[in-house]
Amino acid sequence: MNLKKRIAVVAYKNKLGHLGSYFSSVEIIDKIYSKMGKDDIFILSSGHAALALYVCLEKYKGKDAEALFLKHGGHPHRDEENEIYCSTGSLGLGLCVALGRAVANFKRKVHVLVSDGECAEGSIWEA
């Protein structure tokens, strides 16, 4: 599956912005998902790159990227049934949730993608 092409199709059809965020994140998310264990979880802290997450969930978990976008919009909302483990959009929130989930269950790996802009948020430094 060509993830960038899928992003372009869904973004064009739904008149979405943030293409730079989608395209710069999708290969990282794809690599993480390709190495994840069955009990591992992934949290996208930079929620504005949601479409990149949705196409990876389509590739690895059989979800429909466009249906996820229509349900959640441009920022993911917590939906564990669809393997979205944190509502993101407020910068810095995802890392805090990922840290909490990792501490709560040491047997499961928690992967999180944080954007550069988030690193200026106080919650990142507190986590």
Name each region found by the language model:
Residues 2-16:
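N-terminal capping segment at the start of a domain
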